[in-house]
Design a protein with these regions (language model features):
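N-terminal, positively charged/glycine-rich alpha-helical extensions of SAM-dependent methyltransferases
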Residues: 1-46
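Class I SAM-dependent methyltransferase SAM/SAH-binding core
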Residues: 76-80, 84-134
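A short acidic, Gly/Pro-enriched loop at the edge of an enzyme's catalytic core
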Residues: 133-145
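A short SAM/SAH-binding and catalytic strip from SAM-dependent methyltransferases
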Residues: 144-156
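A short glycine-rich, Lys/Arg-flanked "PGG" loop and its adjoining helix->strand segment in the class I
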Residues: 158-170
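Conserved beta-strand signature within the Rossmann-like core of class I S-adenosyl-L-methionine
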Residues: 172-179
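Conserved Class I S-adenosyl-L-methionine
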Residues: 208-267
Length: 267
């Protein structure tokens, strides 16, 4: 079953979202202190600065990841769409888990591997290039999986959850953050992730709305746009244009969006 066959499922995301876009983000852009300074300004005390996470990850989100995943020392955690690895590495350190990060951006994977030693011993983390719906991991090899703000990038969202159902051991949990939207004008809006999750073979255990998700994200976009000259000078036009595009395209739609955190489980 694909997206188009599930009630509430949607068409693929914008075609211009590519691995190359994320290579710029995880490479040139992420190496600038500008981005993390602006994130601190937007999120304030809720921002876990050490992670340098691209997603809208807060201390609240990290706490829910810990409680939802229920993973312990020596177990295998998968960080799906890991980017530069901040979320997965923090969780591996906090829980004692063995981490595998998967991302479609080679630059993100390289940066995650380079940062790993800041969080855990070298043997506790590995990172591979792979797709949201085709990780390359062995069946039933993971005790838990997490994905921060990325499942919506998949061309076939159902396939993401089917891949998690394949990779997770029976009873293991997959916790992810995303947004839901009631905007009838947006062909890429997901009004409800539950039917997509279940079509992929997982069970929804809980859905929570992320506190201040809309306000904090708008604050970050406003900060980017207010400092665009500094961003152009520090990052270059191409990377700055990526940020402007996101802020100007997504910002006006936030009134229709709700940030959500789902805890799901393999049967």
């Amino acid at each position: 079953m694909t997206d188009s066959q599930v009630r509430g499922a949607v068409v693929p995301p914008r075609a211009e979202i590519t691995p190359e876009t994320f290579d710029r983000a995880h490479g040139t852009t992420a190496k600038s202190e500008l981005m993390w300074r602006m994130a601190r300004e937007a999120y304030g005390a809720d921002y876990p600065e050490e992670l340098q996470a691209w997603g809208m990850t807060t201390w609240w989100t990290l706490g829910r990841f810990i409680s939802g995943l229920r993973i312990s020392t020596g177990q295998h955690l998968v960080d799906l769409a890991c980017g530069r690895g901040g979320v997965g590495l923090w969780l591996a350190r906090a829980t004692g888990a063995q981490l595998t990060g998967v991302d479609w951006s080679p630059a993100g994977v390289r940066e995650a591997a380079a940062r790993a030693g800041e969080f855990v011993p070298a043997h506790r983390a590995s990172f591979i290039v792979g797709d949201l719906a085709a990780t390359g991991l062995a069946p039933a090899s993971a005790d838990a999986a997490v994905c921060a703000d990325a499942v919506f990038f998949a061309l076939d969202r159902v396939a993401v959850f089917a891949e998690m159902a394949r990779v997770l051991r029976p009873g293991a949990r997959f916790v992810f953050t995303a947004d839901e939207s009631d905007d009838p004008a947006s062909p890429a809006a997901v009004p409800d992730w539950e039917p997509i999750v279940e079509a992929g073979g997982l069970v929804v255990e809980s859905r929570e709305e992320i506190p201040r998700w809309r306000e904090d994200l708008q604050g970050m976009y406003d900060t980017w746009l207010a400092n665009i000259s500094e961003l152009r000078q520090g990052l270059g036009d191409e990377s700055a244009d990526d940020l402007v595009q996101e802020a100007t395209l997504v910002g006006p739609t936030l009134a229709h969006r709700t940030g959500v955190l789902y805890t799901t489980r393999r049967r």
